[in-house]
Amino acid sequence: MIIVAVAVFCFYILMPHKENKKLVAYFSATGNTASVAQNLAKSIDADLFVIRPTSPYTADDLNWRNDKSRSSVEMSNRSSRPEIATKIDNITQYDVIFVGFPIWWGREPAIIDTFIESYNLSGKTIVPFATSGSTPNTDEAAADIRLLAPKANVVNGKRFPVDVQATELKTWADEFIK
């Protein structure tokens, strides 16, 4: 009996365990989210994907005080779907997808909605993370993503300052990738 128990224990220890395949996908208009996303991907050994708009955002596009700026127009229309210039060839290989973005108007930018709707994310764990100077969390963004990807496991995620340390990112992300 002891020999069997030792054999089972050794088999379990020596058997390779499948680690979740991770992706950090992000949109960054000014570079703040890019910095956090790059640190996150490096700290958890994840693939990195830039959600790049077909038409890059200019400073005028990002002027939230102008109702006619591109970002204001997109964010005032919930059905707006800015076109993405980049594509993930095989999203099925990923188990956990961290989706990063700046908070615009208290939620995710419309290009994130384009990204979410572009793929079958059924069975994936989607973890939003964001940068923002004022919005305290990603709860509204997570709720929006849940509506767009109802068969995915979308968690509430977290907002980070641009100067967040890699160790903090790893500690936070580890709860979703084990």
Placement of each model-derived feature along the sequence:
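N-terminal beta1-alpha1-beta2 submodule of the flavodoxin-like/Rossmannoid cofactor-binding fold
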Residues: C10-V96, G106-E108, E117, T167-K178
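Glycine-rich, phosphate-binding/catalytic loops in enzymes
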Residues: T114-E117, D144-R146
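Short, conserved loop/helix-junction motifs that constitute active-site signature segments
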Residues: I91, E117-G123, A149
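Short, structured coil segments at secondary-structure junctions
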Residues: S43-I44, S122, L148-N153
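Glycine-rich, N-terminal phosphate-binding loop of Rossmann-like dinucleotide-binding domains
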Residues: F101-P102
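Hydrophobic membrane-insertion alpha-helices, especially the h-region
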Residues: M1-C10
